[in-house]
UniProtKB/Swiss-Prot annotation:
Topology relative to the membrane: Lipid-anchor
Ranges spanned by the short sequence motif Effector region, renumbered to the chain: 34-41
GO molecular-function terms, A-Z: GTP binding; GTPase activity
GO cellular component: late endosome; lysosome; phagocytic vesicle; plasma membrane
Lineage: Eukaryota, Amoebozoa, Evosea, Eumycetozoa, Dictyostelia
Signal peptide: none
Protein keywords: Cell membrane, GTP-binding, Lipoprotein, Membrane, Nucleotide-binding, Prenylation
GO process terms (BP): hypotonic response; phagosome-lysosome fusion
Family: Belongs to the small GTPase superfamily. Rab family.
The protein's name in its UniProt record: Ras-related protein RabM
Organism, as annotated: Dictyostelium discoideum (Social amoeba)
Length: 202
């Protein structure tokens, strides 16, 4: 029996900390480094309900610096994580832009997990209030874009809600795959753990 191959991509503005979240999920560590501009790729075989599943996670990193992401990063995605900095107004407002781009290039109704980063930093008057975030989620649900928005506030520095957010994404990705039966994903012939380069800013 062939293994199911699931693809999850990570989206969000530069410097919101999405690469730190990604690296923490992959390595369990938090490291500060210079921002990288090439996407990172991670692949691992998991067993879910006694069935082998290949999980492929793409961190798009700073590809948004160019004229939009290449459609290749979106192709055959089963779920995406949408990241913003809970202390950065612009990154919150740009969630709609990222979601629109994902909906444009992804095939079918692809689910997503909303991730707020830098939970370890105390909120101030300039931070995004939980009420605004809840309202954004409600608006998305009311529009029928997704039945339920799964939202997690995370801290890569202290490994808070990292595993939980990606477990939710994995569950949604598997449900999407089972409904759509996508063809296998072509992935680079690399050792994915070596390809992941810990970084802070993207």
């Amino acid at each position: 029996m062939s293994k199911k191959s699931l693809k999850i991509i990570t989206l969000g503005d530069s410097y919101v900390g999405k690469t730190s979240v990604f690296n923490n999920f992959v390595t369990g560590k938090y490291e500060i480094n210079e921002c990288t501009v090439s996407p990172s790729f991670y692949s691992k075989t998991l067993t879910i309900e006694n069935e082998p599943v290949i999980l492929n996670v793409w961190d798009t990193c700073s590809q948004e610096r160019f004229n939009g992401l290449s459609p290749i990063y979106y192709r055959w995605s089963n779920c995406y994580t949408l990241c913003f900095d809970i202390h950065n107004e612009k990154s919150f407002k740009n969630l709609d832009k990222w979601m629109d781009e994902a909906r444009k290039f992804c095939i079918g109704k692809v689910p997503f997990v909303l991730i707020g980063t830098k939970k370890d930093i105390p909120r101030t008057d300039k931070s995004i209030s939980k009420e605004r975030i809840e309202q954004w989620c409600k608006n998305i649900e009311d529009q029928g874009i997704i039945d339920r928005v799964h939202y997690f506030e995370t801290s890569a520095k202290f490994s808070q809600n990292i595993t939980e957010s990606y477990n939710a994404a994995l569950k949604l990705a598997l449900e999407h795959y089972n409904k759509n039966q996508k063809p296998p994903i072509t992935t680079p012939a690399i050792d994915s753990l070596q390809e992941v380069k810990p970084g802070y800013c993207c």
